[in-house]
Amino acid sequence: MAVPGVGLLTRLNLCARRRTRVQRPIVRLLSCPGTVAKDLRRDEQPSGSVETGFEDKIPKRRFSEMQNERREQAQRTVLIHCPEKISENKFLKYLSQFGPINNHFFYESFGLYAVVEFCQKESIGSLQNGTHTPSTAMETAIPFRSRFFNLKLKNQTSERSRVRSSNQLPRSNKQLFELLCYAESIDDQLNTLLKEFQLTEENTKLRYLTCSLIEDMAAAYFPDCIVRPFGSSVNTFGKLGCDLDMFLDLDETRNLSAHKISGNFLMEFQVKNVPSERIATQKILSVLGECLDHFGPGCVGVQKILNARCPLVRFSHQASGFQCDLTTNNRIALTSSELLYIYGALDSRVRALVFSVRCWARAHSLTSSIPGAWITNFSLTMMVIFFLQRRSPPILPTLDSLKTLADAEDKCVIEGNNCTFVRDLSRIKPSQNTETLELLLKEFFEYFGNFAFDKNSINIRQGREQNKPDSSPLYIQNPFETSLNISKNVSQSQLQKFVDLARESAWILQQEDTDRPSISSNRPWGLVSLLLPSAPNRKSFTKKKSNKFAIETVKNLLESLKGNRTENFTKTSGKRTISTQT
């Protein structure tokens, strides 16, 4: 989907580099005394430094450790719908009677909400015991005990102050482009884009809390189950405003029921059986969908999409503002998230390049939120990883090389698919490649603008081009389910559009090397120029490139042809366009 309002750049004078910095919105975490919230204010990070500005965003720890820590944190957290005007100090004082508070923040989504993390899980029980079910004269409330509360004031007029809330959405396009035009270099632009689009600490906490609230409901049917987030919410490539993908993990329930042999007796649970795992999945999701629809506070627009290849329940969690997709036992997707988490943590340039390529694709409608023949963000991410594996020296290791570093603890086979790779980041040697982001962005467009898509596939497991196993226009091998093509949906016309835009973008960046605008110029430059809609002069560039290619083709044909038909052929051959290959 194209960036809304991106066309405003053709009319607004946004790119004059200001002497005064653009004012950034306040984004903060409110912490109780003694709590350090060092990594939560985006505006305190230097906009041009990947090394110091973003390294602490990707901790050098295992994915499983991060997941467990976040989940435990979410279990000690409550979500409270608050009045618009509320005294923050009185609010905290009231909640502190139930137990010490670790930290909290406010945000807005169909009202004002507070996310409050207690130091101990037992404090939530105390708060629930002091809470009552609302009653109205006209309607009957369905009693449901959860960690989602509604706070009312007995005296509305006594509170006059407003709390400052954290930002859960990216900046407007105008603000973003002003920041990008102010940057000192293209590298600085890519880093700024990353900082503005990446998930904040607050947003990440809210995502895990939402999963934890859904888990509470699912646990009524399946004790010891876990609702795990996966995809962009956890792989460090998520953008503010992205959907929340989650799956119901029943493996813990199965593990608890593992056979425990005691003498001659073997005890089993009485269960119901169904013909296949797919039918079991459909029945489980059907029940959970009904539960969310009828009893889930804040869950609206529930859709049970049970006949899809991967059955799911889709709903909006109104309180958090997230569009959610719930599946079951999707462990391969979680493993893919872990792999991307590792790649994003290995080199600070990876995420900056991925975010910029995705933004570029969205600005030119190469990607869309609507399913169809478009390239997906996941496919673009795989293409960036593959490109970085192909650099000399490589910036990222291949999946096969990560597999060779794995030990017995890392061994993982899911549904017959080998998903083994090293999980310990400290065992992976950092790259010796020192190329700039500006060079990598330009080389990315040149590489895929000239890639032999008609013959070769993209394979991050081996990090090299391979012959395509079928005739799909774009073939990107699934890293774990290796017989699948993750880009099978992409049409030839969409691929050709990608190639044409990649070539054009490479040319624009090449021109930046020789014709970079002065500080006083108001002309869009660098990354901003790549996000502009095609202008007449840029269309003429594409046409000139096409004509040049056609002229060279005709010239070669003329040399091999004889007779009076040569002249007539010359007049009609100029319409030929650039093919996918060069």
From Swiss-Prot:
Keyword DNA-binding carried by entry: no
EC annotation from Swiss-Prot or TrEMBL: 2.7.7.19
UniProtKB keywords: Acetylation, ATP-binding, Cytoplasm, Disease variant, Magnesium, Manganese, Metal-binding, Mitochondrion, mRNA processing, Neurodegeneration, Nucleotide-binding, Nucleotidyltransferase, RNA-binding, Transcription, Transferase, Transit peptide
Main location: cytoplasm
Transit peptide boundaries: 1-37
Residues with PTM N6-acetyllysine: 90
The protein's required cofactors: Mg(2+); Mn(2+)
UniProt binding sites for ATP: 107-109, 241-242
GO cellular component: intracellular membrane-bounded organelle; mitochondrion; nucleoplasm
A single BP term in Gene Ontology: histone mRNA catabolic process
Effect on the protein of changing residue 312 to A: Reduced enzyme activity
Reaction catalyzed: RNA(n) + ATP = RNA(n)-3'-adenine ribonucleotide + diphosphate
UniProt note on tissues of expression: Ubiquitous, with stronger expression in tissues with high energy requirements: heart, brain, and skeletal muscle.
Residue numbers binding Mg(2+): 243, 245
GO molecular function (one): identical protein binding
InterPro entries membership: MTPAP-like_central, NT_sf, PAP_assoc, RL
Domain PAP-associated: 437-483
Location of this chain's protein in the cell: Cytoplasm; Mitochondrion
Subunit structure: Homodimer.
Similarity comment: family membership: Belongs to the DNA polymerase type-B-like family.
Function (record text): Polymerase that creates the 3' poly(A) tail of mitochondrial transcripts. Can use all four nucleotides, but has higher activity with ATP and UTP (in vitro). Plays a role in replication-dependent histone mRNA degradation. May be involved in the terminal uridylation of mature histone mRNAs before their degradation is initiated. Might be responsible for the creation of some UAA stop codons which are not encoded in mtDNA.
Record disease entry: Spastic ataxia 4, autosomal recessive: A slowly progressive neurodegenerative disease characterized by cerebellar ataxia, spastic paraparesis, dysarthria, and optic atrophy.
Protein name: Poly(A) RNA polymerase, mitochondrial
Annotated source species: Homo sapiens (Human)
